[in-house]
From Swiss-Prot:
Belongs to the peptidase M20A family. N-acetyldiaminopimelate deacetylase subfamily. It comes from the Bacteria. This is N-acetyldiaminopimelate deacetylase. Pfam families: M20_dimer, Peptidase_M20. Gene3D superfamilies: 3.30.70.360, Zn peptidases. NCBIfam families: amidohydrolases. The keyword Amino-acid biosynthesis applies.
Length: 374
């Protein structure tokens, strides 16, 4: 498949962004592309709104897997591109449209240039939430198609096209969604002494949560608590009875995650006492760290560099969350960053990756699989 064809596919996918486990149009689009290939070369299995696609090897003794996430974000696109989102309020602001396109490019290559071993492609829904990797790993499909190895990539807007970045060991952080609900006694704004103000309680809570990082976390460790949204109150002259906070926790170790959560519970108990209210803490979605398999990762980096498939950079750990970590917990493999050179970063309404990154990724992965799947 030529790069022009892949870019056209990417733009089609960019127009139809869908949220986690709602990727019905996306799934059908992928099927329309894949069903053009000879069915003796590929096998397709639907899984919820995702897909498993096996490219049959000539004399398979093992199976190498590649994962591409397919969901979008609840963001109103502001790129002004002629192929901008047609689903208002949703946007491919994390590059998953490129991820899918790259996977299709790799599949196309190996349908026409078979290798010895089987290749399995996982088009995974709901990476952004509520988390598609764990349930996908439990599917019946993976009971008959068991990978020996798995890999994935993620675009990096801050890196130039033609580069990849990765490292052995920890690449992405442990992440957890955080939801806190406060409930007190509302009242008239003229009589604050007769009420318990949950907006003030929530404001105090936000500042106290940050002391967990500055005063309870080892300075040589890394942890981040972000409160992204606060809602509370119904009118300007009514003291709020409830407040709702949502955010994330990110750490570089599971022990730090445990400690941070314990301290959050303590801080919320203090708010309950101080503001005579009730607090409830929940963690709706938790993502395991992405930990690249030693040996395989270095081998991949050396291969790409030696064959000049891309410029290879030694990555640093990132506080990014990725449910691909669950797949690496079950199978050996690695993940890497793909340079995509965009002025605006991931999850930004103006993210506009350089589409030439698609060709780089297809070149890297077809070169790698051509050797390691033979």
């Amino acid at each position: 498949m030529k790069i022009e064809e892949l870019i056209a596919i990417r733009r089609d996918l960019h127009r139809i962004p869908e949220l986690g486990f709602q990727e019905f149009k996306t799934q059908q689009y992928l099927l329309n592309v894949l069903e053009q290939y000879p069915q003796d070369r590929i096998e397709i299995e639907k899984w919820r709104t995702g897909l498993f696609v096996k490219v049959n090897g000539t004399a398979p003794e093992k199976m190498l897997a590649y994962r591409a996430d397919i969901d979008a974000l609840s963001i109103e696109e502001q790129t002004g591109l002629p192929f901008a989102s047609e689903h208002h309020g949703n946007m491919h602001a994390c590059g998953h449209d490129l991820h899918m396109t790259i996977a299709l490019g790799i599949i196309d290559h190996f349908v026409h240039h078979p290798v010895k071993h089987d290749l399995l492609f996982l088009f995974q829904p709901a990476e952004e939430g509520p988390g598609g990797a764990e349930p996908m790993l439990e599917s019946d499909v993976l009971k008959k198609w068991q990978p020996d190895f798995i890999t994935a990539l993620h675009i990096a807007p801050e890196l130039p096209v033609g580069t990849i970045a990765t490292k052995s060991g920890l690449l992405f952080a442990n992440t957890s969604e955080l939801v806190i609900d406060l409930e007190g006694k509302g009242g008239h704004a003229a009589y604050p002494h007769l009420a318990e103000d949950m907006v003030v309680a929530a404001s105090t809570l936000v500042t106290q949560l940050q002391t967990i990082i500055s005063r309870n976390t080892d300075p040589l460790d890394s942890a981040v608590i972000t409160v992204g949204t606060i809602t509370g109150g119904s009118a300007q002259n009514i003291i709020a009875e409830t407040a709702h906070l949502e955010g994330t926790i990110r750490t570089l170790s599971e022990e730090s995650m445990k400690q941070v959560k314990e301290r959050i519970e303590d801080v919320v108990k203090g708010i309950e006492i101080g503001f005579r209210c009730k607090g409830k803490v929940t963690y709706p979605s938790v993502y395991h760290q992405v930990y690249n398999t030693s040996g395989l990762t270095e081998e991949f980096m050396s291969f790409v560099a030696e064959h000049q498939l891309a410029t290879v950079i030694e990555a640093k750990e990132a506080m990014t969350g990725e449910d691909f970590g669950y797949m690496l917990k079950k199978y050996p493999g690695f993940m890497f960053w793909l340079g995509a050179d965009s002025e605006h970063g991931l999850h930004h309404a103006k993210l506009n990756p350089d589409e030439n990154a698609i060709e780089t990724a297809v070149h890297v992965m077809t070169g790698y699989f051509s050797v390691y799947a033979n």
